[in-house]
Amino acid sequence: MRAIIYLLLISAMVFSMTKAVPEEEGLQLSEDERGGCLPHNRFCNALSGPRCCSGLKCKELSIYDSRCLG
């Protein structure tokens, strides 16, 4: 009986997570993201990886967090 309840709970959680972001919204990319640059407040890596869009710089906020900021 417990196994059935757990299975139902897990199924409900997975279903709610997939419905949290509409499919069209999840698949849309902005012009800047398609071009390879990162928009404002996105995670970045100052040493490698995609660069921030024009006017933004990759700023290190902590040892584990760098973001594109103006």
UniProtKB/Swiss-Prot annotation:
N-terminal signal peptide: 1-20
Tagged with keyword Repeat: no
Major localization class: secreted
SUPFAM superfamilies to which the protein is assigned, alphabetical: omega toxin-like (SSF57059)
Keyword Secreted (UniProt): yes
Family per record: Belongs to the neurotoxin 01 (U2-agtx) family.
Function comment: Insect active toxin causing rapid but reversible paralysis in crickets. No activity shown in mammals. Does not show effect on mammalian voltage-gated calcium channels.
Domain comment as written in the entry: The presence of a 'disulfide through disulfide knot' structurally defines this protein as a knottin.
Name of this chain's protein: U2-agatoxin-Ao1d
Organism (species): Agelena orientalis (Funnel-web spider)
Lineage of origin: Eukaryota, Metazoa, Ecdysozoa, Arthropoda, Chelicerata
